[in-house]
Amino acid sequence: MAKNEDLILTIDSDAEYDNISESSEEEAEEAVSVKSKKKNNNNNNNKKSKAGKHGKANLEEAEAEEDDDEARGEMNLDFQFSLGDDLNEIKDWEVEEPAKDIDLNEIIKKKRESKKDGNGDDEEDDGDEDEDASESEEDDEKEELKAAGKNGQAGDDDEDENEDEDEEEEVDTKEDLDNFYESQETNTSASALKSKTFQELQLSRPILKSLQQLGFTVPTPVQASTIPIALLGKDIVASAQTGSGKTAAYLIPIIERLLYVKNSTSTKAIILTPTRELAIQVHDVGRKLGQFVSNLNFGMAVGGLSLKQQEQQLKTRPDIVIATPGRLIDHIRNSPSFSVEDVQVLIIDEADRMLEEGFQEELTEILSLIPKQKRQTLLFSATMNNTKIQDLVQLSLNKPIKVSIDPPRTVASKLEQQFVRIRKREELKPAVLYLLLKKLEGRTVVFTRTKVEAHKLRIILGLLGLTVAELHGALTQEQRLANVKAFKNNVNVLICTDLAARGLDIRIEYVINYDMPKTYEIYTHRVGRTARAGRKGTSISFVGESMQDRNIVKNAIQFNSRSVARKIDWDEVEKIQTKIKLNEGAIEEVIEEEKQAREIMRAEMQLNKAENLMKYEKEIKSRPKRTWFKSEVMEHLTKHGKKVNAKKRKANEERKEEGKERSYKKTKADRTKLKTKAKSSSKKRK
């Protein structure tokens, strides 16, 4: 099979992970040199013939997989990124972490081999779970699923009550909100936009040429709705289903706008994303869409990659900067050659995800640095029924136009949702997961609630003989990219937390919810990793006894009829559970061995750091101290480095507002006098 077939056919693909991760393993000898815009233009032109060859091959592969379903007309399936291209500005970057790391696979392999020597052959017979499944179990689960579908309205009533409570807390009335938004509102169904083409959107030739070469001819609904409004310079609040092509929906109008801006050495557009991986994908898509535009430069400001190299790149004042919120603020404050004074367009991608990750303060700080009167703002969010989202919209946008494409709370039409009733058998979940993974053929993403659980599952499955990768916040940037590369190339199972729920754009056949998410919205984000662009996909969810899990199942059945109970051979599960219990000692040994190796590595890092501090002491001390906006706020609110609790902080703020702030510090004598006065006044009252 051709390597290109592994990628999903949407414009949001992350085709360049191979090149990034390969380069991150090598130490860069020099910092990124300052490139002129002319040189960048030549580099883009050198890629034309290469992209053309891959575009033709990908077009033929996409046509071979065409389906007659209506959904195929709604999504563009003629486009596919090529794995042969390079990321000019990222491939030689260093990662912030050292290349040295613990080889967990080797530790697991040794433990597995030692277990085999001690216990003999542990190979199990796969069996046929569909034939051996308990019929009574299946009937019970089917009846419960039917009942859940019938009682779906009851779940909605509960949600309506919660919504009423939220509405009571809000200060703004419906009339105020209506006045805040522009009168024009776009709420479009996919079928209404089938006939639209990019030519009808009146885009410039360089953009049309790049779209044509990439095989991208028919815009998705969100692109057809958003691009014309964005080209008018209006602010936009867009809500669309995950994987609907929103990356191109905001990149195309930005590039179109920059075509008519006179050459200037300043950054004109900033794109904010919640994760580094998504920022890398957006950078890749933008570079491909702008390959025929003269002197168009892209920059990145994300955590995990070398800070110095990013500073060198930002010195060139790239036209478009893709960033994560924290690193962008760091560069604005501490990189002297980088400025946001001339920014004309601000994109907030996956705003709901940013707020979930706790970036509210960072977003507020960025918005204060780029006043909304000077910029056009496009905000994209998968969900809008959130008070924090509404607050962010009012803070960041000026008379925005709403664009709502898909009906809320829906999942892809070709997704089959399967549910496994766990009941009170939580301890059997690893065994059930192993049984499923042995049966499934194709790439599978397993979602867990915590990174500790994800890591432990990797060890358990590894000791049982499965090769799996993990992706979560406890990993370094180098480890993340290496694991994504492995998942794309030779590993079929990726265990991850919600970090990757909206960051991966690799073709995935199965999504397993090992732990059910907290909300139905997060559930839709997770299962949205499969059944994309009109393809078929399957989600399998382990459902517990909590009301939270039950409500998610009710909503899933109500909004998608393709929901079934999956049959499980519980006798086979019990056998696998016995093996897992026998491996409990080995699991603890692997965790302990990994912990010791990590401590040794950390000690070596501290030693190297101390040596560097001594060796380069003068150079380090001569550098200006890096600042952070939160530190300055706390420094302003505290005295002599002492922490101020919320009660004292509020009292200090009230004194300032009333003009009663003390101009001196109370002495011991002052406090004694106050106590004496208080006692005398209390005696008089008596």
Curated annotation (Swiss-Prot):
Residues 586-666 form a coiled coil. It is found in: Nucleus, Nucleolus. A motif (DEAD box) lies at residues 349-352. ATP binds at A240, Q241, T242, G243, S244, G245, K246, T247. InterPro entries: DEAD/DEAH_box_helicase_dom, DEAD_box_RNA_helicase, Helicase_ATP-bd, Helicase_C-like, P-loop_NTPase, RNA-helicase_DEAD-box_CS, RNA_helicase_DEAD_Q_motif. GO terms for biological process: ribosomal large subunit assembly; rRNA processing. Residues 227-402 form the Helicase ATP-binding domain. GO terms for molecular function: ATP binding; ATP hydrolysis activity; RNA binding; RNA helicase activity. Pfam families: DEAD (PF00270), Helicase_C (PF00271). Residues 414-581 form the Helicase C-terminal domain. Residues 17-30, 60-71, 120-142, 155-179 have a biased composition (Acidic residues). ATP-binding RNA helicase involved in ribosome assembly. This is ATP-dependent RNA helicase DRS1. It comes from Lodderomyces elongisporus (strain ATCC 11503 / CBS 2605 / JCM 1781 / NBRC 1676 / NRRL YB-4239) (Yeast). The gene is DRS1.
